[in-house]
């Protein structure tokens, strides 16, 4: 029997079982079916009972009065009582009498009334419902002739010409008349073209093709609104625009032929009604829909009607799905006339947002400023690259509205505590009722009313506070910027005072980690400041540099310091060691493997990393080690801030800082100084640096192509480290060692003699600071490791590292420190 039940009727039975569980009964009687009919809320039975002033709360009270609560033990499968089974049989009989091949909520209600002797009938009687009028009311709502049916006649007169279509679709024209659709702004050209195609004699089926989120479905809604406003040619007047849900059409078709029968019925209804325009969103889902075990799919069933003009259909799909599914079937493709829906411009998007403003203000109960709407379109276009206008801009104002409303509607802490207490009181009261302790329940009810009154008083006092603005909260440009920053990680918000201070003193902060190299630190700091203030070119990366110079002078270290200071941590930097890209085929690792090769689905290392983190530093370390083809790939990144990956997606590099390090020219630097290794006057040092820089630039020109070098913002040649700078770096390295050994609860220090020895051994102008690191390892870390392992230094000790007169490194414990003085 249940296979004939509609979805709503099945929901009623499920709700009836839930009601039985709630009351602790191990059976489903007529009274539970009645509660299910009222609780379902949307069916004809619920509407009839609602019109007779029957609500779920009162019905539950009456049922509980008559049958009370059960033991509380309820089986998983709850059986029907004999009377309830009789109601189900009578509902089947009622459906047959009305000529229906399904059992709906209305038939269950008529069966319930016809049975007439169960608890349900007593409940309705107690609620002062005229039981005798229920059947007539149901039949009237069904659109039947009451007299003919009361006498048992099988003649039916359907209220609607298209019942199946209404079951599996939504009437957009009716929704437009009721004001249920969002206004459609612009798109007049596309709507006119759709009307033009619909006016054809045959093949009058437009298909809207465009990227996701450009407003394809909105065009169908715009047509429905124009029909509702009678702003269409006479050929389209009184037409119904109905959107078909293909998923719902396929759902529940258990047996072969059921799907075809549904679709055939819909086509027959459309043909006989002769005033229906069918809208199928995601029209590519027709291909293969319902085609199980050799059955014909929906597309093949629709083809004849589409070609002959019997069926006016508006399809909507994306460019990719159209190419993948519909273009592969030329017979289906020729029946549809494509209408390309392009992405609107920023100005058009702002107009669309102004048109939608009222709907979103009403929903969120606030006001949206003009600046916020303009900012939403501008920021969405500039910073959110993998989606399309106007959808991404609408999402921004929607989420900003939600955020502002939530921030303005938070309860005071006192009210939150009371709310928590109220929930506990309600729970205890319910438990007391179940245990039939009515006196205790009454006490808890009194407490419940008291708490509710207190919460209401707090809410009222909050409203009456004079310092609060009684007007609706306003969504501003800053709120939109906050949402963009949360989505993308790109700071779009206005600069705060603390952030301005941070940017102004950026050089000093970076110099805490990078000794010397003023030119590089200043160039990087300027680029970051330009970008954050919003003065950089919006179509190029923040900046692009080549750091060239001898090894070990801080090229990579500066990039790490920048990532750590400004982007959160060193891990936030995208680092590509170009020595891994020496072969030609490794280019594909950056942008993804081509189709047909292993790893195609995974995407490229570079492109995927930037998609996830669009605001970051990208370090191409040791750039000269890479294969020359890599440089060709970098050309469009440097110039236009974009790169297309193997899947054809455009990746946005406009908010990245590109740094390439190179050792080209290190030999020139080593030889070019002439008197290197000797102390030079400041003028001599500067003239020597200028000469070295020009020599390095010449060598770079020999190695890289001119079009590559010409696209870079700056080529920075790092200086060789002086002895004083090496001494400062030694201090930094020693502090790192002190911090590491402090974790083992050992206090460490070194003497000036040891520092001097460290600098002497670690200073080599040709190799930068790396020999110093080796010297720290050899002279300090090795000595300490031996002392710790031998047990001479233990947790809680203090130690000093010194150098003896013979030049040997020695570690002295705390009690021997006076020997140093």
UniProtKB/Swiss-Prot annotation:
Query: Which residue ranges does the record annotate as region Repeat 1?
Result: 5-70
Region spans: Repeat 2: 80-144
Primary place of residence? Answer: plastid
Molecular function (Gene Ontology), one example: ATP binding
InterPro entries the record matches: AAA+_ATPase, ATPase_AAA_core, Clp_ATPase_C, Clp_N_dom_sf, Clp_R_dom, ClpA/B, ClpA/B_CS1, ClpA/B_CS2
BP terms from Gene Ontology: cellular response to heat
Record localization: Plastid, Chloroplast
| Known function | May interact with a ClpP-like protease involved in degradation of denatured proteins in the chloroplast.
From the Swiss-Prot or TrEMBL record, give the protein name. ATP-dependent Clp protease ATP-binding subunit ClpA homolog
- List the source organism: Pyropia yezoensis (Susabi-nori)
* Source organism phylogeny: Eukaryota, Rhodophyta, Bangiophyceae, Bangiales, Bangiaceae
């Amino acid at each position: 029997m249940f296979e004939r039940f509609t979805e709503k009727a099945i929901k009623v039975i499920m709700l009836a079982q839930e009601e039985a569980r709630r009351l602790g009964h191990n059976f489903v009687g007529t009274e539970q079916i009645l509660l299910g009919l009222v609780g379902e809320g949307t069916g004809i039975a619920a509407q009839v009972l609602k019109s007779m002033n029957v609500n779920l709360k009162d019905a539950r009270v009456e049922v509980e009065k008559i049958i009370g609560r059960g033991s509380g033990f309820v089986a998983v499968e709850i059986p029907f009582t004999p009377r309830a089974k009789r109601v189900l049989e009578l509902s089947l009989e009622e459906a047959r009498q009305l000529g229906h091949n399904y059992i709906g909520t209305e038939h269950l209600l008529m069966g319930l009334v016809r049975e007439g002797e169960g608890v349900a009938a007593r409940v309705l009687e107690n609620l002062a419902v005229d039981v005798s009028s229920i059947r007539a009311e149901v039949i009237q709502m069904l659109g039947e002739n009451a007299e003919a049916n009361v006498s048992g006649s099988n003649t039916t007169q359907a209220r609607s010409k298209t019942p199946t279509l209404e079951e599996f679709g939504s009437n957009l024209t009716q929704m437009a008349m009721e004001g249920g659709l969002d206004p459609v702004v612009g798109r007049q050209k596309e709507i006119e073209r759709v009307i033009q195609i619909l006016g054809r004699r045959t093949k009058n089926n437009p298909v809207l093709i465009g990227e996701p989120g450009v407003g394809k479905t909105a065009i169908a809604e715009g047509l429905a609104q124009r029909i509702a406003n009678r702003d269409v040619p006479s050929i389209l007047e009184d037409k119904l625009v109905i959107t078909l849900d293909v998923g719902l059409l396929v759902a529940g078709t258990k047996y072969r032929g059921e799907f075809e029968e549904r679709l055939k019925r819909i086509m027959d209804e459309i043909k006989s009604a002769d005033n229906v325009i069918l809208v199928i969103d995601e029209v590519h889902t027709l291909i293969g829909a319902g085609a199980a075990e050799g059955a014909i799919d929906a597309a093949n069933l629709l083809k004849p009607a589409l070609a002959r003009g019997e069926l006016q259909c508006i399809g909507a799909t994306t460019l990719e799905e159209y190419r993948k599914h519909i273009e592969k079937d030329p017979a289906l493709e020729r029946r549809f006339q494509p209408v390309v829906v392009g992405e609107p411009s920023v100005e058009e998007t702002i107009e669309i947002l102004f048109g939608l403003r009222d709907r979103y203000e009403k929903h969120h109960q606030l006001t949206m400023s003009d600046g916020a709407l303009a900012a939403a379109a501008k920021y969405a276009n500039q910073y959110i690259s993998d989606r399309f206008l106007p959808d991404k801009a609408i999402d921004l104002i929607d989420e900003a509205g939600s955020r502002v409303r939530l921030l303005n509607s938070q309860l005071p802490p006192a009210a939150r505590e009371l709310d928590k207490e109220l929930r506990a009181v309600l729970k205890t009261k319910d438990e007391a009722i179940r245990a039939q302790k009515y006196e205790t329940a009454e006490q808890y009810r009194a407490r419940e009313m008291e708490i509710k009154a207190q919460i209401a008083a707090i809410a009222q006092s909050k409203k009456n506070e004079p310092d609060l603005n009684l007007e609706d909260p306003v969504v501003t440009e800053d709120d939109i910027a906050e949402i963009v920053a949360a989505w993308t990680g790109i700071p779009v918000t206005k600069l705060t005072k603390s952030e301005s201070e941070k940017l102004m003193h950026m050089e000093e902060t970076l110099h805490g980690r990078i000794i010397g190299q003023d030119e590089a630190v200043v160039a990087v700091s300027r680029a970051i400041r330009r970008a954050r203030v919003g003065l950089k070119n919006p179509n190029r990366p923040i900046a692009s540099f080549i750091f060239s110079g001898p090894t070990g002078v801080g090229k990579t270290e500066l990039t790490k310091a920048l990532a750590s200071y400004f982007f959160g941590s060193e891990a936030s930097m995208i680092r590509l060691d170009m020595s891994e890209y020496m072969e030609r085929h490794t280019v594909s690792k950056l942008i993804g493997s081509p189709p047909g090769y292993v790893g195609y689905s995974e995407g490229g290392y570079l492109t995927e990393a930037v998609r996830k983190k669009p605001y970051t530093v990208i370090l191409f370390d040791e750039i000269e080690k890479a294969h020359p083809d890599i440089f060709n790939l970098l050309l469009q990144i440097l110039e236009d801030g974009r790169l297309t990956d193997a899947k054809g997606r455009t990746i946005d590099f406009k908010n990245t800082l590109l740094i390439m390090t190179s050792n080209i020219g290190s030999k020139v630097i080593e030889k070019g100084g002439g008197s290197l290794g000797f102390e030079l006057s400041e003028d001599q040092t500067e003239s020597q640096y200028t000469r070295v820089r020009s020599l390095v630039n010449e060598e770079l020109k020999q190695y890289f192509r001119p079009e590559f070098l010409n696209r870079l913002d700056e080529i920075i040649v790092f200086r060789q480290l002086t002895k004083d700078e090496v001494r400062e770096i030694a201090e930094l390295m020693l502090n790192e060692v002190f911090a590491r050994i402090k974790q083992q609860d050992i206090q460490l220090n070194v003497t000036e003699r040891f520092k001097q020895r460290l600098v002497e051994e670690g200073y080599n102008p040709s190799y930068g600071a790396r020999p110093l690191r080796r010297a720290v390892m050899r002279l300090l870390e090795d000595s300490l490791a031996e002392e710790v392992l031998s047990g001479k230094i233990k947790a809680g000790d203090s130690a000093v590292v010194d150098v003896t007169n013979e030049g040997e490194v020695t570690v002295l414990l705390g009690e021997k420190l006076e020997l140093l003085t």
